[in-house]
């Protein structure tokens, strides 16, 4: 196409909106400005980033984590939500573990104790707040981690040579227009969901060669061509038998939006083109970043072409969304990353470069901004054995997450690649990435039409308990009834609520840690206790994507890590230390030992669980946790105060149809109806359970029709359980915020008996709460372990003004 030499060059003035705007557009521009302002004020966007201590684990280990919760356009630590929910999800999309963290001004720390019976596989860590659920779940924090169980076989593996590819094409701005040169992004994805490097050509429907293309190692790239009238185009990979992949069909009219970065000053160059066939050429270009309006332009397209140069400093740091409107309809859109280099610089200085095993290390940390001014912030540090842990230099970190991947939908593979200065092509790769991405945080048509997100989930500052008060006979909701709540964790709590017309009652923002025994007493408006409670289950969001199975091949680092893990397990089994134990002189005890066998009138089941043999049981808050993930075929699912349990393939007849097994406590059956709500087991301290017997199949025939779906028998240590019933009342255990647990970092300068134990930990040091002072400084110390290796440290965090920071350092440990 021959382009008229008359180009429109617009230099953005210091004001937010250009003075060249015509009067007839002012009302629309005002609508855009006021709408964006309302959106950011009334619908503030929260984000979460999790820093974990290492990239992979074995069953029985602990995932140490730090949560960074930010809100608003400038990523400042959030003061809105306090409750952060963290889920661990397996390859089948099932919830495996969940914790609640209490954020203090946007920062929280926690841990996930992995059961030693966990199956090997890829798992997903997911984190979100109640408020975030009002928007697209795709913007929850998600991270895949590998977990191995050396004692269990690896299932659902994926072969690494499965190279089935999907190739997609994305015209810049969204459209191809006949006769206008266009830039087209491409993305090649394999069967495992990750990008694959490809080469190929573009052909038309006659097989005529048009141009060649080549992707980067992440499977993305771009090429240019001029689509002709009525021609269909295809992309074809190098392989002879490769199937053709169609390009979008070019339109006869429309607009092409091209945005690049000036190599001289980093300014943004915007090119807008149309053709003679396009009649209405009145357009406006709107630039916004995270809901902040940067500017609005009204270019002149009377010559079908406009060139606009915008100074770099007119943009915020991060992704700017450029949207071209024709009238009030968006017709083209482009994302561009503007790097204002506002990230915090972290200088980490060990007092030495080489240390001996078990020697003290002192680290000095200094945080500064781009003007070398001190920065106060909150950070977390992980130090790992580099022989056991391969740290991907391009892995996601807090800077890449907040500025890039949290703004986009879908997996952003190796997002740290685009921020690693060692990658010379990172800017080109980032531009190719954004060519293949679409904006999803809000849709222009919806917000301009006043279609705001439905706020079904409130900002949550604590633990919420809600439900319905019902009549004991009719099961109808009771209005104006009184509900009294009593609890004693950590102090005595006495609260009252009045049920609404629909019988609903609520207690909001309860503050307790670990678990709390909750007692609810209800009465109707005549002060009678003829009521029952229907407590709301925890409403968990669905997990919409697929977690890819583990690859067959292990890296050398992973093999070394698993070997070391087995050694650590053997060492842990050989050395037991409890400094609280006092050894007494031997004494003779006269009496008889009472066997629990006669008490078990139904005998032994197909599986017996001795609770004393379950590691980590001291953290359990419900007896069902003894079964969770430990007995093949027994599935335990928690949903708020409700617990569902089933035995797969246990039914031996059609009698007693259903899915729930018979549950007994000290030989006393729990009625099946009670299992639909909060069952009596919830009021029993898990540490009071002595053993559990599981019956399935023909073994359960001893229970008659009641055992058609199997039977699970719990035996307490006293063996004298009797159900306690109170009219109009229930008692249950509720999960609170996770209590803080400190990472064990031995102090080898003070001799202790436990120090004879070999120390081959993969995570040498974990500190989730590092705060710099007014000068941007802090100092910390820890000790090396017995590994002779290079140790790698990863420091991440956030300034109190919302600037992300990440840095790495290393030191050597060797015997001298």
Cite the ranges covered by each PLM segment.
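Short, small/polar-rich motifs associated with maturation and membrane association
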Residues: 302-304, 318-321, 326, 330, ...
């Amino acid at each position: 196409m021959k382009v008229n030499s008359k180009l429109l060059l617009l230099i953005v003035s210091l004001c937010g909106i250009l003075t060249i705007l015509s009067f007839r557009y002012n009302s629309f521009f005002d609508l855009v400005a006021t709408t964006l302002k309302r959106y950011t004020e009334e619908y503030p966007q929260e984000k979460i980033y999790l820093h974990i201590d290492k990239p992979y684990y074995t069953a029985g280990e602990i995932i140490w984590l730090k949560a960074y919760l930010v809100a608003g356009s400038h990523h400042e630590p959030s003061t809105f939500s306090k409750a952060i929910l963290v889920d661990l999800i397996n390859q089948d999309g099932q919830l495996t573990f969940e914790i609640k963290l209490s954020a203090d001004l946007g920062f929280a720390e926690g841990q996930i104790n992995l059961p030693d019976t966990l199956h090997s596989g890829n798992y997903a860590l997911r984190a979100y707040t109640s408020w975030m659920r009002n928007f697209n779940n795709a913007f929850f924090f998600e991270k895949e981690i590998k977990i191995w169980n050396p004692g269990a076989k690896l299932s659902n593996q994926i072969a690494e040579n499965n190279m089935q590819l999907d190739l997609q094409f994305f015209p810049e701005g969204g459209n191809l227009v006949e006769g206008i040169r266009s830039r087209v992004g491409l993305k090649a994805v394999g069967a495992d969901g990750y990008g694959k490097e490809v080469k190929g050509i573009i052909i038309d429907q006659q097989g005529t060669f048009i141009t060649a293309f080549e992707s980067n190692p992440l499977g993305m790239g771009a090429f240019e061509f001029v689509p002709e009238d009525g021609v269909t185009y295809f992309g074809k990979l190098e392989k002879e038998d490769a199937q053709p992949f169609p390009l979008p069909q070019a339109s006869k009219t429309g607009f092409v939006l091209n945005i690049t970065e000036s190599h001289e000053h980093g300014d943004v160059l915007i090119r807008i083109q149309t053709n003679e066939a396009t009649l209405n050429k009145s357009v406006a270009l709107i630039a916004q970043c995270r809901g902040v309006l940067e500017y609005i332009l009204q270019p002149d397209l009377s010559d079908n072409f406009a060139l606009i140069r915008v100074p770099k400093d007119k943009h915020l740091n991060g992704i700017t969304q450029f949207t071209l409107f024709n009238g009030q309809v968006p017709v083209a859109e482009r994302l561009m990353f503007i790097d204002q280099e506002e990230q915090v610089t972290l200088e980490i200085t060990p007092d030495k470069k080489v240390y001996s095993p078990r020697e003290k290390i002192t680290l000095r940390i200094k945080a500064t901004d781009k003007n070398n001014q001190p920065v106060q912030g909150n950070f977390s540090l992980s130090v790992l054995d580099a022989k056991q842990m391969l740290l991907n230099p391009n892995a996601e970190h807090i800077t890449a997450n907040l500025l890039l991947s949290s703004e986009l939908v879908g997996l952003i593979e190796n997002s740290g690649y685009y921020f690693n200065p060692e990658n010379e092509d990172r800017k080109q790769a980032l531009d190719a990435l954004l060519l293949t991405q679409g904006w999803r945080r809000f849709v222009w048509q919806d917000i301009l039409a006043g279609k705001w997100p439905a706020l079904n989930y409130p900002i949550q500052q604590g633990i919420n308990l809600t439900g319905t008060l019902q009549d004991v006979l009719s099961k109808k909701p009771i209005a104006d009834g009184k509900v009294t709540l009593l609890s004693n964790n950590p102090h005595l709590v006495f609260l009252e609520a009045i049920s609404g017309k629909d019988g609903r009652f609520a207690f909001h923002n309860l503050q307790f840690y670990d678990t709390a025994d909750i007692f609810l007493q209800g009465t109707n408006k005549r002060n009678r206790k003829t009521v029952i409670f229907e407590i709301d289950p925890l409403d968990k969001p669905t997990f919409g994507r697929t977690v890819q199975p583990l690859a067959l091949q292990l890296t050398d680092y992973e093999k070394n890590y698993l070997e070391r893990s087995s050694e650590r397990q053997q060492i842990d089994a050989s050395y037991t230390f409890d400094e609280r134990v006092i050894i007494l002189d031997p004494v003779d005890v006269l009496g008889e030992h009472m066997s629990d066998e006669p008490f078990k009138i139904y005998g032994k089941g197909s599986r017996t669980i001795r609770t004393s043999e379950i590691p980590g049981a001291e953290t359990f808050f419900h007896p069902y946790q003894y079964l969770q993930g430990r007995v093949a075929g027994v599935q335990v699912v928690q949903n708020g105060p409700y617990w569902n349990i089933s035995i797969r393939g246990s039914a031996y007849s059609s009698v007693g149809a259903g899915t729930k097994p018979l549950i007994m406590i000290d030989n006393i059956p729990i009625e099946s109806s009670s299992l639909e709500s909060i069952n009596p087991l919830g009021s029993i301290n898990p540490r009071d359970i002595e053993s559990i017997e599981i019956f399935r199949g023909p073994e359960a025939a001893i229970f008659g029709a009641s055992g058609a779906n199997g039977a699970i028998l719990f035996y307490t240590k006293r063996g004298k359980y009797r159900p306690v019933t109170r009219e109009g009342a229930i008692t249950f255990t509720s999960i609170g915020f996770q209590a803080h647990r400190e990472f064990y970092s031995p102090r080898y300068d003070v001799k202790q008996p436990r120090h004879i134990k070999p120390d081959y930990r993969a995570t040498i040091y974990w500190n989730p709460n590092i705060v710099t002072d007014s000068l941007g400084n802090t100092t910390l110390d820890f000790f090396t372990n017995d590994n002779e290796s290079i140790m790698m440290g990863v420091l991440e965090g956030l300034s109190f003004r919302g600037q992300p920071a990440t840095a790495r350092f290393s030191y050597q440990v060797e015997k001298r």
